[in-house]
């Protein structure tokens, strides 16, 4: 299912980030060595009333002058108008109505999609009265909230969720292995997809996907059905660098949410960038099976240690993805392209793997006996048993007397023991700790 996008726009300091954080909620950091994943994020998948959508905070600019401010607001609103399914235009109830707000409101009146005009920082009756000037705008869907104090936010989200487009997943898509090809612009995603489909000698049946020209292509490999989600078509003429950078990440995010296996495409000529780290981090956080595909390998000068050096670079930059296989290819020459589908089948098998409870507890008991959890508030942590409760990714529940006291390093230790014992290549593992009365 393609997730709808909700964009928050508005001047600096009107509370966009506060509302964004309020809707996203607090999220546990996965590990400390994950640059770009939990820091400086301005997009997130949110679920409200069992409805998932992608939320974007389009802010973060500090212009030098009022003219520059208006220019930034116009550009920001244009991005939202083109890319989002629902727009939240935030204004400051304390500061009052601003001429720049008025101009953007006039622009948003002409948009043929749901727009909510939201007056923020309305914390009490006095400010409610002061905010009445915003009603002079004469717009529908004008709501007052306090993102900081959670006032009116639920009512706002009731309206937003009701306005989201309804999308469904076909039975064919549910039963197929879905592969997302993601990466920043110019890493060679489009060429890679074309080569991959050509190599498999299939007749592609492209289906328009999102408004950013993503394309879904069905194909068959080794008598198995696959859906290839290609996000390569996002760079179009007349689009700004800001849009390319922001929405290439968002488009990848949408594809990742739909996928089982994510091909994270890197450019061998340019190495690993912060945006690569961001996209890979989201794939891991979303619980997807992953493969690193280093493209344009033909374009660099090589010696006997070139592969080893690049592998070391990836392992250094993506310490938390040490379980992800790496394939070096050239979309231009077709070099090693057959390895991609081989790895897809391998990691997919691990992604849906189930292990028996007896085997799991044999490994679990040995791991606990070999290395005890540190004391929590002076008390010993006891473990009772483990069981697998799900796949995509493999998910395990561990029963203990201190489910709230688990140290992240011990959780990582158990994950590594499970991975080593059961060969969970290419897939993240999820551990859930629950209490049990004795």
Swiss-Prot record:
GO terms for molecular function: GTP binding; ribosome binding. GTP 2 binds at residues 183-190, 230-234, 295-298. SUPFAM superfamilies: P-loop containing nucleoside triphosphate hydrolases. Residues 353-437 form the KH-like domain. Residues 4-168, 177-352 form the EngA-type G domain. It comes from the Bacteria. GTP 1 binds at residues 10-17, 57-61, 120-123. Coiled coil: none annotated. Pfam families: KH_dom-like, MMR_HSR1. InterPro entries: G_ENGA, GTP-bd, GTPase_Der, KH_dom-like, KH_dom-like_a/b, P-loop_NTPase, Small_GTP-bd. Keywords: GTP-binding, Nucleotide-binding, Repeat, Ribosome biogenesis. GO terms for biological process: ribosome biogenesis. Belongs to the TRAFAC class TrmE-Era-EngA-EngB-Septin-like GTPase superfamily. EngA (Der) GTPase family. Associates with the 50S ribosomal subunit. GTPase that plays an essential role in the late steps of ribosome biogenesis. NCBIfam families: GTPase_EngA, small_GTP. HAMAP family: GTPase_Der. This is GTPase Der. It comes from Geobacter sulfurreducens (strain ATCC 51573 / DSM 12127 / PCA). The gene is der.
């Amino acid at each position: 299912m393609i997730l709808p996008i909700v964009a928050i726009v508005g001047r600096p300091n009107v509370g966009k980030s506060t509302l964004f954080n309020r809707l996203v909620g607090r999220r546990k950091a996965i590990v400390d060595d994950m640059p770009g994943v939990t820091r400086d994020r301005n997009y997130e998948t949110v679920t409200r009333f069992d409805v998932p959508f992608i939320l974007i905070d389009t802010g973060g600019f500090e212009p030098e002058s009022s003219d520059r401010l208006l220019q930034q607001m116009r550009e920001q609103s244009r991005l939202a108008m083109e890319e989002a399914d629902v727009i939240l235009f935030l204004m400051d109830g304390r500061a009052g109505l601003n001429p720049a707000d008025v101009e953007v409101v006039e622009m948003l009146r002409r948009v043929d999609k749901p727009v909510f005009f939201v007056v923020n920082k309305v914390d009490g009756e006095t400010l409610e009265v002061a905010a009445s000037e915003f009603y002079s705008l004469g717009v529908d869907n004008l709501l007052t909230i306090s993102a900081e104090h959670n006032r009116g936010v639920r009512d706002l989200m009731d309206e937003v969720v009701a306005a989201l487009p309804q999308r469904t997943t076909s039975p064919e898509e549910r039963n197929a292995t879905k592969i997302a090809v993601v990466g920043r612009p110019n890493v060679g995603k489009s060429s890679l997809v074309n080569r991959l489909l050509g190599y498999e000698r299939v007749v592609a049946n492209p289906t328009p996907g999102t408004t950013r020209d993503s394309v879904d292509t069905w194909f068959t490999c080794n008598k198995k059905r696959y859906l290839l989600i290609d996000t390569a078509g996002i760079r179009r003429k007349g689009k700004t660098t800001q849009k390319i950078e922001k929405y290439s990440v968002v488009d990848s995010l949408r594809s990742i949410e739909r996928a089982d296996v994510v091909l994270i495409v890197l450019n061998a000529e340019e190495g690993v960038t912060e945006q690569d780290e961001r996209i890979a981090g989201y794939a891991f956080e979303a619980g997807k099976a992953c493969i690193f595909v280093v493209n344009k390998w033909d374009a660099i000068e090589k010696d006997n240690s070139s592969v080893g050096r690049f592998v070391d670079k990836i392992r250094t930059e993506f310490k938390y993805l040490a379980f992800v296989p790496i394939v070096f290819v050239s979309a231009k020459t077709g070099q090693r392209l057959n390895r991609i589908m081989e790895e897809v089948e391998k990691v997919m098998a691990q992604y849906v793997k189930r292990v028996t409870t007896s085997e799991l507890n044999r490994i679990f008991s040995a791991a606990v006996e070999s290395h005890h959890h540190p004391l929590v508030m002076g008390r010993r942590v006891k473990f009772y048993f483990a069981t697998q409760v799900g796949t995509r990714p493999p998910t395990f529940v561990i029963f203990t007397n201190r489910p709230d006291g688990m140290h992240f390093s011990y959780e990582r230790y158990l994950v590594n023991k499970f991975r080593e014992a059961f060969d969970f290549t290419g897939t993240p593992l999820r551990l859930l700790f629950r209490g049990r009365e004795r």
